[in-house]
């Protein structure tokens, strides 16, 4: 059985959604950032960078959310084509999320929600760049139902971030193709199950406190 080390974050949800979509059995280990469980010697042996998510499959550890998605797709032969061009298209959009949407929206989250000082220049910079990336997604989705044509790990990687656009103060208004994509993916039963792993705290203030504490870690 796959061991999943995770938390209720967009990156964590990528992997739980993929596991649910693939129907793979897994055991959840929900790590507490408040308790610095992602920095324990035991977890650092799984991910030397001390970040979630990570998995252990039959003694083999995989860290970095994109690498985990590729591993699961290749393990099962699903959610990514086997031909070179189809695989490349999935990986292009996966890397677009990993190198663009995730980092930019992550910084928008930090400066809009968590940073102790209000740095309007930083807020504007990251919100505007995140919106620009959303517009790229919208243009792509005007010509394809999903990012790589068929539903794939590229969509699974991107959806958990875009769905929380409000948290970063970024609008999807006017992006009708992106909105359609969000709605379609959000209706998938496996996606709905994956978003509950692990359960997100109901108290918004506790989320903010936890995130603020991580700024110095």
Residue positions per predicted region:
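Short, solvent-exposed turn/loop segments enriched in Gly/Ser/Thr/Pro and often Arg
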Residues: 32, 153, 198-201
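Residue-level signal for nonpolar/aromatic packing positions in well-ordered secondary structure
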Residues: 55, 68, 137, 155, ...
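GST-like domain detector, emphasizing the conserved glutathione-binding G-site
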Residues: 1-131, 138, 143, 211-212
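Short secondary-structure boundary/hinge segments and terminal tails
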Residues: 36-37, 73, 183, 202-204
């Amino acid at each position: 059985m796959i061991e999943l080390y995770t938390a209720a974050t967009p990156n964590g949800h990528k992997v739980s959604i993929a596991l649910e979509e693939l129907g793979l059995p897994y055991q959840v280990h929900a790590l507490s950032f408040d308790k610095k469980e992602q920095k324990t010697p035991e977890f650092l042996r799984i991910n030397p960078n001390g970040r979630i998510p990570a998995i252990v499959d039959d003694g083999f550890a995989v860290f970095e959310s994109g690498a985990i998605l590729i591993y699961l797709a290749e393990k099962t032969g699903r959610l990514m084509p086997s031909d070179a061009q189809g695989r490349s298209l999935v990986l292009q959009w996966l890397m677009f999320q990993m190198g663009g949407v995730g980092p930019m929206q992550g910084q928008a989250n930090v400066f809009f929600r968590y940073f102790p000082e209000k740095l309007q220049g930083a807020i504007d910079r990251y919100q505007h760049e995140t919106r620009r990336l959303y517009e790229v997604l919208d243009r792509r989705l005007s010509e394809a139902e999903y990012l790589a044509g068929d539903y794939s790990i590229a969509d699974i990687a991107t959806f958990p971030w875009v769905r929380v656009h409000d948290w970063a103060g970024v609008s999807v208004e006017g992006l009708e193709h992106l909105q359609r994509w969000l709605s379609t993916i959000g209706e998938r039963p496996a996606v709905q199950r994956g978003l509950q792993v692990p359960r997100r705290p109901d108290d918004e203030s506790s989320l903010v406190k936890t995130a603020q504490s991580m700024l110095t870690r």
